[in-house]
């Protein structure tokens, strides 16, 4: 049913046949490899981030065209503040440049912007760019482009537990009534319902770890790791990752239909 190409080879443009009925509703991507991409070309790390921003634009449109409902991109983690100051300052400027140049295309493609993370800790100009993008695309009802910005899964879970504890303390919730749905509603992905949890998680650049990203939400996600660095990631690479996803038998803890 499917024709695959090597998802580790960005130069391989062999067509991939996808089942349009089995496109993952929520795709999450850990965008990794910008710095190594730049280093391999004897460029400063920020050059990799700039090229990575261009990749975000291309993949956003590609995912929307494929019928993805939510595209979540890990843009900046709570741990990324440990990077060199010049690099952090550049990364904080990227959302401003991105939204200034790309919001018209998002509106044209009916894509709505959502941001999760501790946005109030970001520089004022970055916060303003985020707020404007959300406001400008609020009437779009196609794919949601969800940025994880100053986000960390452990911090998210702590914040969610604090919300639930406050509800219990205020008499709004009984301890015995706390269940999966309670936790889902307390997490930063709640506004994405019913697509809170990624169906497919992709990490680029050959690293095979989760890096404090959506740890509650990926309990039953399919994971695809590709050697392709984020600036080299193309629509064809995305299609190959989705083809890999479609080749799998998702069991959600149960038995395979073939056994």
From Swiss-Prot:
Catalytic reactions of this protein: 8 isopentenyl diphosphate + (2E,6E)-farnesyl diphosphate = di-trans,octa-cis-undecaprenyl diphosphate + 8 diphosphate
Keyword vocabulary terms for this entry: Magnesium, Metal-binding, Transferase
Record-annotated active site: 32, 80
Family matches, as HAMAP family: ISPT
Protein name, UniProt field: Ditrans,polycis-undecaprenyl-diphosphate synthase ((2E,6E)-farnesyl-diphosphate specific)
Binding site for substrate: 33-37, 45, 49, 77-79, 81, 83, 203, 209-211
Cofactor comment: Binds 2 magnesium ions per subunit.
PANTHER family for this protein: DEHYDRODOLICHYL DIPHOSPHATE SYNTHASE 2, DEHYDRODOLICHYL DIPHOSPHATE SYNTHASE FAMILY MEMBER
UniProt subunit comment: Homodimer.
Transferase listed as a keyword: yes
Gene name of this polypeptide: uppS
Similarity comment: family membership: Belongs to the UPP synthase family.
SUPFAM superfamilies hit by this protein: Undecaprenyl diphosphate synthase (SSF64005)
One of the GO BP terms on file: polyprenol biosynthetic process
Stored InterPro entries: UPP_synth-like, UPP_synth-like_CS, UPP_synth-like_sf
Names of required cofactors: Mg(2+)
